[in-house]
C-alpha cells in the first residue's frame, strides 16, 4: 500500500542527576538536540525526504531555559504526514532507547515507539507487529496482526563502529552518506526556527 501517516514518540524521564551538567539546562541542551535529532534520521529513512516542518516547545515542568517537551509536524515530499512528540519529563515506555534493545544501558520495555500507517496495513517499530484486515479493508472488519519475527542484532553499536572502520579503510560504502547527515541537520535547524516563530518552515 501507500504510506499515509506516522506517529513517533520519544517519552522518557531524566532524573535530577542528568542536570548536574549545567549545559543541559541551557539552550541546545534539551531533548530536541539530544534525543529528537536521532529520530529525524530514522524518520527520513522510513518515510523519505521531508518537505516542511512545524514545531512547538514547552518548558512546562522544569522551567529551565531549555525545552523539556516538543511536538513536530512533518510533511513529506510523498504527501505523507507524521507527528513526533519528545519529552524528558514523561515517565513512559515509548522511546527508541527503551524499545530497540540496542544499548544495554537502557532497560527494554518490549513496546514500540514508531507507528507507520498505510492503505493496506500498519506497522509498529521496532517490535515489527503488522496490522491488517483479511479480505475487505474496513474499520467494521476485524483487525489481525502478525509478528514479522526478524531477528535484530543486539550488537548494533558495535556493528556501526565496525562499519565505520570498513568505510575508512575503503572496504565498504557508507550506509548513511554525508548528504543524509546534512539533510538531517537542515531539518533540525528548521524545527528550531519553527519553534521560535510558530511558522511552517520549508526544507530546501
Residue ranges and their predicted role:
Residues 1-65, 70-74, 198:
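Predominantly a Rossmann-like dinucleotide-binding segment in NAD(P)-dependent oxidoreductases
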Residues 7, 54-56, 85, 117, ...:
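Residue-level detector of conserved, well-ordered beta-strand and adjacent loop positions
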Residues 29-31, 148-152, 170-174:
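Active-site rim elements
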Residues 34, 156-159, 176:
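Residue-level signal for the nucleotide or nucleotide-sugar donor/cofactor binding architecture
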Residues 38-42, 112, 160-163:
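Hydrophobic alpha-helical segments typical of transmembrane helices
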Residues 63-67, 77-159:
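NAD(P)-dinucleotide binding in Rossmann-like oxidoreductases
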Residues 70-72, 112-114, 174, 192:
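Residue-level detector of beta-strand structural context in well-folded domains
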Residues 125-126, 163-204:
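C-terminal helix-rich "cap/oligomerization" subdomain common to oxidoreductases
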Amino acid at each position: 500500500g501507500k504510506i499515509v501517516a506516522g506517529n513517533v514518540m520519544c517519552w522518557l524521564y531524566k532524573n535530577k542527576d542528568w542536570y548536574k551538567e549545567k549545559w543541559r539546562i541551557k539552550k541546545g541542551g534539551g531533548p530536541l538536540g539530544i534525543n529528537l535529532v536521532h529520530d529525524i534520521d530514522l524518520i527520513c529513512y522510513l518515510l523519505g525526504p521531508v518537505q516542511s516542518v512545524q514545531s512547538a516547545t514547552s518548558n512546562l515542568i522544569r522551567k529551565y531555559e531549555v525545552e523539556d517537551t516538543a511536538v513536530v509536524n512533518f510533511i513529506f515530499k510523498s504527501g505523507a504526514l507524521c507527528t513526533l512528540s519528545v519529552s524528558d519529563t514523561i515517565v513512559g515506555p515509548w522511546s527508541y532507547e527503551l524499545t530497540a534493545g540496542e544499548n544495554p544501558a537502557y532497560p527494554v520495555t518490549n513496546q514500540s515507539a514508531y507507528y507507520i500507517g498505510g492503505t493496506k496495513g500498519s506497522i509498529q517499530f521496532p517490535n515489527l507487529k503488522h496490522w491488517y484486515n483479511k479480505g475487505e479493508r474496513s474499520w467494521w472488519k476485524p483487525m489481525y496482526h502478525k509478528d514479522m519475527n526478524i531477528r535484530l542484532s543486539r550488537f548494533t553499536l558495535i556493528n556501526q563502529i565496525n562499519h565505520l572502520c570498513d568505510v575508512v579503510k575503503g572496504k565498504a560504502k557508507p550506509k548513511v552518506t554525508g548528504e543524509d547527515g546534512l539533510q538531517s541537520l537542515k531539518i533540525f535547524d528548521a524545527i528550531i526556527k519553527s519553534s521560535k516563530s510558530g511558522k511552517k518552515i520549508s526544507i530546501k
